[in-house]
Structure formats: structure tokens, C-alpha cells
Amino acid sequence: MSLVSNSLALIERGANEILKFDELERRLRSGRPLRIKAGFDPTAPDLHLGHTVLLNKMRQFQELGHQVIFLIGDFTGMIGDPTGKNVTRKPLSHEDVLANARTYEDQVFKVLDRTLTEVRFNSEWFGKMSAVDMIKLAAQHTVARMLERDDFAKRFVSQQPIVIHEFLYPLIQGYDSIALRADVELGGTDQKFNLLMGRALQEHHGQPPQVVLTMPLLEGLDGVAKMSKSLGNYIGIKEPPIDIVTKTMKIGDDLMWRWIELLSFKISAAEVVALREAVAKSELNPREVKLRLAHELVSRFYDNAAAEKAIAGWQAVVTGQGNNNLLPLQKINVPADGVRLVALLTKSGLAPSNSEAMRKLKERAVRVDGIVVDDAHLHFVPGFEGLIQIGKRNFAKVRLVTSSESHDFPESNGIDKS
């Protein structure tokens, strides 16, 4: 297999779509280092595993000798990306955006090679753009074309407001590709419209249009929704190693393969096939595969010693020989009058449904702080903090809070047996 063919195979792994593949192949055959761009709007502090799907692909391009551009959208972050939204996003102040951006700069090199990375801010060019220039940019696209976007179309049909600045967002993101002379732009599948806008604008400005590579959106810990801080189903890349291990070990077996495909550098596609076969034949416990993934993630964000220590700590806890204080604390929002045990088991992610929680209770497989419980009506109120467990290895250390509370709770065991 030729060098270009090997490169294409690596680039294709985990990708959802490449537009246009023949253009990418032609540029790779040119032998020159390509400029690979991906933009990140710092609308919240800190990066999580969902962000690293793109970062991992950028790192693969670096390993092939290409230059990547980690673009911080400090200008676009103040506008707010309307992608996938059914309402207008609340704009952030420039101060908030810059504060969030600083956390990105600190963390991005846990994945990327610093020597092959340009960190850029799109305020570099938009901060100098005049009102006339912005109007000229807006004149390069039509409202009808904008309304072809699924999210805009739905809002238009349902008579939900679309503010004019939201129409500017795809144009502004597209202009970034002109300013950076991007050869390839990476983005999530939900960004395809914006990425194609970059191609169109580059062509309009006499530049070769960029290749668009979309990556799938990583499902969060629940295995259903996109990983998101607002949903609480995420693993932050600067979380303590024991937290990364514990959360990774809780994901479902089906989700495990998805995460390996999108997050692992060390487990090859061929090895995944072999591992899947071994698990299917019950020759290998899925837990061992998750441990490999957890070890790789902690090693990447910290080092090998931290990974070994975290896994040893996790194993000690699950075998009853360790300290529960090592476990991450999961805060769960509940109503002011509390929640019953069945709901707590599902909210914590220990059970996928109320019916499964009930089944485990009937099997006497549920423990609260080490004590077997089978009362589905056991009631927990805000302030409860403890270890809940299903079986030997499925557990969560939780604290119940209400959305309006952020202070410390008065001393209470938090269990209401009435």
C-alpha cells in the first residue's frame, strides 16, 4: 500500500463524510504539508471528550506531517452558533469568551503537537473588518439558501424568531477559511452547512475550495445524547484520573466500541475486529476492553503512571478493598421534595430504565452505602450523599441537590423512610 493510501486509510477512520475525497487525495499526492483547520467557539470553559474527537483527527494529520490550525472563535463565540438550536442563543461578553478561551489554550496540547499547531483567534481579522466589509460579506449569500438549513427551516415554519445576526454566523465561519487559506476543515456532522459555506466563499474569492471532513458527534455517558456539559453526560479532559477511569468504566458495552473508534489511537481497526469477536464469544470480558480505553485516555491527558494509579484505585474500590472517597461525586438535581429510589437509580445512570431498576431491586442487587435494599418506595431528599450500587461493579457516589441550591447542606442522612 502506498504512502498516500496509508494516509487516506488513517484519515478515513471514524470519519462520517469527506467532501471531496478525490480533492483530498490529489492534495496529499502533491507532497506539501496541508493546512488543516478546526474552529472551537469558547462558549463554556474546559474541553471534554466530545471536543477531542476533532482534536484526535487533527493529531492524526499532524502525525502525517501536516500543519493544523486550532482556531478559537472569540469573535463568533460572542454571536453564538445557531446550529441545532430552536431558539436564539444568548450572546456572551468578550470577557467571558476570553476567559473560556484561556482554558482551551491550556488544555489543547494534551492532544495536539505544539510544534505543528497554530493557535489563532478569528478576532484577528474580524476585529479589523469595517461595517462595509461585513455588508459585502453578507451580500455573498441569499436568505433562501440560508433557509435550506434544517434548524433555520424548522424555526421559520414554526414561526420561531430567527435573528439576522444568526444568518451571519455561517458566513463568518466560512470567511475564517479564507483568512487562514485552509486546505481541509474539520467539524461535527452538525456543522456540514457551515463547512460547505467555507468552500463556497473560498471559491468566490479565488482560492482552491477546502476539503470538508465531518466527524460523528460523540454520545455522552448516557449513550443517547451528544456529550454536553449542560446535560452532565461528559468527561472533562482535566478531570482527576480516577474520575476519568470511573466514568469510562460505567459506559454501556455498545457505547464502548463507538468510543474506541472515535477516541483511541492505540487500538487499531483490525484489533477492534478481534476484540469484538472475543467479547461476542465470551472469551473476553468487556470490562477489560474498557480498562484499556480508560488507561489510554488517562495516559494521554496525564501520563502512564497516573493511569496505572487510577486503575489500581478503581479496582481496589470495586473489590471492596479501597477507599470510596476516591470515587468522583456525582451531583444529581432532584425536586425539592426529593426522589424515590427507582428514579435515583435511573438518574444516576446505574439503570437504563425504571423497569430495569425495579427488576434489580426485586433481585436484591441494589445497595445503598453497602446495605442491600429492595424497597422501591425508599425516598431520598436533597442533601443525601452516599454510595449506591447495582451488582459488584456498577456504582455511583451521589449527592442530591436542587437546581436552586449551591450551598452546603445541613447535616442529614437524606433518607426519608416515611
Curated annotation (Swiss-Prot):
Q: Name one Pfam family in it.
A: tRNA-synt_1b
GO BP term (any one): tyrosyl-tRNA aminoacylation
Keyword Flavoprotein recorded:
no
Question: What compartments host this protein?
Answer: Cytoplasm
Q: What class of enzyme is it?
A: ligase
Under catalytic activity, the entry for this protein gives:
tRNA(Tyr) + L-tyrosine + ATP = L-tyrosyl-tRNA(Tyr) + AMP + diphosphate + H(+)
EC number(s): the record gives 6.1.1.1
Query: Where does motif 'KMSKS' region map?
Result: 226-230
Checking SUPFAM superfamilies in the record gives: Alpha-L RNA-binding motif, Nucleotidylyl transferase
Single GO MF annotation: tyrosine-tRNA ligase activity
Q: Which Gene3D superfamilies match?
A: HUPs, RNA-binding S4 domain, Tyrosyl-Transfer RNA Synthetase
Family, according to the entry, reads as follows: Belongs to the class-I aminoacyl-tRNA synthetase family. TyrS type 2 subfamily.
Its biological function? Catalyzes the attachment of tyrosine to tRNA(Tyr) in a two-step reaction: tyrosine is first activated by ATP to form Tyr-AMP and then transferred to the acceptor end of tRNA(Tyr).
Q: What is this protein called?
A: Tyrosine--tRNA ligase
The scientific name of the source species is Xylella fastidiosa (strain 9a5c)
